[in-house]
UniProtKB/Swiss-Prot annotation:
Belongs to the DapA family. PANTHER family: 4-HYDROXY-2-OXOGLUTARATE ALDOLASE, MITOCHONDRIAL, DIHYDRODIPICOLINATE SYNTHASE. It holds the Pfam family DHDPS. This is 4-hydroxy-tetrahydrodipicolinate synthase. One of its GO terms (molecular function) is 4-hydroxy-tetrahydrodipicolinate synthase activity. GO terms for cellular component: cytosol. CDD domains: DHDPS. It comes from the Bacteria. Pyruvate binds at T55, I211. GO terms for biological process: diaminopimelate biosynthetic process; lysine biosynthetic process via diaminopimelate. HAMAP family: DapA. The record marks T54, Y117 as: Part of a proton relay during catalysis.
Length: 300
């Protein structure tokens, strides 16, 4: 059994928002909006933010833009929340360069996605994640999301990677609770729910928290859910989980980027529109989203 000698909840947080990247009307990164949003999320209960992930539209942002966003958010909230930099790509050499650059800017940790599009074998995944983890002293979270990468990180590969001292956890977005529970027991890796619809089930099998999209709109409720579960008040945790369910339905319809940006605008926080090929919500979609947000008590 491998035991990860790193206090992940204390060092990386338990409620992390996979933060959108705000854009100006001309499509450039809106640093002022990023500062406002980061402060709002931390004030609402998030103890960590993940930048330049799926919801951050990382395939459409340059490395310079990723580093610009990282600097701005670190300056805004880095003294009171953990700031995790998304630093993965389908190119190992590029990922290594980005990891080093993010570490140089002061990131508190790294989220590294499974290489997508090229469908590498498990031996390639092991070599990729090892090369990235070797390139830094920062804690690394693996991001297992085969719905987007096609290839999963198989359980045996995760177990092998757990022996690396810098690989401390997994953002799990493939709904394999059984394997995740066994891996946590076998390795000591920390697991985060990467699927808001499964946040409570993941806690039940041992996950330490969430890397959430709906926390853009409901961070306070998710913090209450975590607190209730941690204190043994499962009834309250279940009630909160059901209450915020409409936001998960909205995300399924619209996608995380479109839902988050439209929902924030409804709450009075303008972070701009997505970059192509993502699309802003239509008027009809915004009306439907507003119904879901009211049902979840996150919009008056």
């Amino acid at each position: 059994m491998t035991t990860v000698g790193f206090d992940v909840p204390a060092r990386l947080g338990t409620l992390l928002t996979a933060m959108v990247t705000p854009f100006d009307a001309d499509g450039s990164v809106d640093t002022a909006a990023a500062t406002r949003l980061a402060n709002r999320l931390v004030d609402a209960g998030c103890d960590g933010l993940v930048l330049s992930g799926t919801t951050g539209e990382s395939p459409t942002t340059t490395d310079d833009e990723k580093l610009q966003l990282l600097r701005v958010v670190l300056e805004a909230v880095g003294d009171r929340a953990r700031v995790i930099a998304g630093a993965g790509s389908y190119d190992t050499a590029h990922s290594v360069r980005l990891v080093k650059a993010c570490a140089g800017e002061g990131a508190h940790g790294l989220l590294v996605v499974t290489p997508y599009y090229s469908k590498p074998p498990q031996t390639g995944l092991f070599a990729h994640f090892t090369a990235v983890a070797d390139a830094t002293e920062l804690p690394v979270l693996l991001y297992d999301i085969p719905g987007r990468s096609v290839v999963p990180i198989e359980p045996d590969t995760i177990r092998a990677l757990a022996s690396h001292p810098n690989i401390v956890g997994v953002k799990e977005a493939k709904a394999d609770l059984y394997s995740g529970a066994r891996i946590m027991a076998d390795t000591g890796l920390a697991y985060y729910s990467g699927d808001d619809a499964l946040n409570l089930p993941w806690l039940a099998v041992g996950a330490i928290g969430f890397i959430s999209v709906i926390s853009h709109l409901a961070a306070g409720q998710l913090r209450e859910l975590l607190s209730a579960f941690g204190s043994g008040d499962i009834t309250t945790a279940r009630k909160i989980n059901v209450a915020i369910g409409p936001l998960c339905s909205a995300m399924d319809r619209l996608g995380g980027v479109t839902m988050s940006k439209a929902g924030l605008r409804l709450q009075g926080i303008d972070v701009g529109d997505p970059r192509l090929p993502q699309m802003p919500a239509t008027a009809e979609q915004i009306d439907e989203l507003a119904v879901d947000m009211r049902a979840a008590s996150v919009l008056r």
